């Protein structure tokens, strides 16, 4: 146990801390492990803010293909400006203390979803992402369990959600409302820092055998382990480009698609619809974006190999192929 503490103490430098923890691990009576209890940090500072005063602000943070395969790029600076819009919108609509608030979102894995999540992280708002195609009954179960103050979705789903908001005491908002905002640069506020064990986000199990169970992820240990595994298992560095074919409703959509790559300062390639990779022409276009790390569901890899053969993956830029 002592070696475990010493090991992770030596890895603290992998991320930025406002207050570096002195309590590395504490095991309480219920056998729950609490990591870095007295440490303080803000994950948004690790992912975005520490790039803005350097030349890396002009570096491509996200390469993004929409559901219709339209392609966009966002530098760290451009991504930050988009996050500011969502930060401003959340500050305006949340009446209670931001760091005590909870937000649930139902959306596909698109750039607006990413900006909303990063705004939540910056403000200390615990969030929960659910699959865009999850049935109304499944969404309602998660609302009852998570008890959000705000539910975020698109206009199409807003009508079905609104009928529950009075009973379950939340307000419902649409991504389209944020689109209407003009300049929100004045929303830059002093950055707050949070204890390492503060809840960052909650993801629910499928609930296929009963009620879904919420798995809560904190910030310090989550980010540190993510960075450690990306560097040591994936071989990621600042020159990497990673494609994690995941959904924002899965854990891999948070650690290896979003927070990890942005924290390291590399480029993450995000697909709104990963199954589009089964289209040969689209797969070719994606892999030509200088992907160095390809992280896919093992089932998808098998299907793609059966359709295209192994040579389709063997681009000169590709260094690591991983499966989830």
PLM features: what roles do these ranges have?
Residues 223-241, 251-292, 306-308:
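Conserved AMP-binding/adenylation subdomain of ANL enzymes
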Residues 178-198, 223-225:
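Flexible, low-complexity linker/hinge segments
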Residues 89-133, 241-248:
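Conserved AMP-binding/adenylate-forming
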Residues 80-86, 215-235:
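Conserved structural elements of the adenylate-forming
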Residues 45, 57-58, 77-104, 112, ...:
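ANL superfamily AMP-binding
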Residues 136, 144-149, 156-176, 238-239, ...:
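Conserved adenylate-forming
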Residues 1-74, 78-85, 91, 193:
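N-lobe entry segment of adenylate-forming
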Residues 73-76, 200-224:
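Conserved AMP-binding A3 loop
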């Amino acid at each position: 146990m002592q070696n475990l503490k010493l090991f992770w103490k030596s890895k603290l430098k992998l991320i930025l801390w406002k207050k570096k923890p002195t309590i590395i691990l504490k095991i309480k009576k219920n056998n729950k492990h609490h990591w870095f209890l007295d440490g303080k940090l803000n994950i948004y500072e690790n992912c975005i803010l520490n790039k803005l005063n350097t030349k890396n602000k002009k570096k491509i943070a996200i390469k993004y293909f929409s559901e219709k395969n339209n392609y966009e790029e966002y530098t760290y600076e451009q991504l930050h400006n988009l996050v500011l819009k969502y930060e401003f919108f959340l500050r305006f609509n949340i009446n209670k203390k931001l760091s005590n608030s909870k937000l649930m979102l139902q959306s596909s894995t698109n750039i607006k979803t990413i900006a909303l999540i990063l705004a939540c992280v910056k403000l200390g708002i615990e969030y929960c992402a659910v699959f865009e195609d999850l049935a109304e009954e499944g969404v309602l179960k998660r609302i009852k369990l998570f008890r959000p103050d705000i539910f975020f979705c698109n206009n199409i789903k807003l009508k079905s959600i609104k009928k529950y908001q009075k009973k379950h005491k939340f307000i419902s908002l649409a991504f389209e409302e944020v689109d209407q905002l003009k300049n929100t640069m004045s929303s830059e506020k002093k950055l707050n820092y949070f204890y390492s064990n503060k809840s960052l986000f909650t993801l629910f199990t499928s609930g296929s055998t009963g009620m879904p169970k919420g798995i809560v992820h904190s910030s310090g240990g989550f980010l540190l382990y993510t960075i450690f595994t990306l560097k040591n298992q994936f071989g990621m560095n600042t020159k990497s480009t990673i494609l994690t074919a995941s959904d924002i409703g899965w854990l891999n959509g948070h650690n290896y698609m979003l927070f990890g790559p942005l924290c390291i300062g590399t480029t993450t390639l995000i697909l709104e619809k990963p199954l589009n990779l089964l289209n040969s022409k689209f797969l070719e276009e994606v892999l030509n974006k200088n992907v160095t790390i390809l992280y896919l569901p093992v089932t998808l890899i098998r299907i793609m190999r059966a359709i295209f053969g192994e040579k389709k993956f063997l681009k000169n830029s590709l260094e690591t192929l991983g499966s989830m």
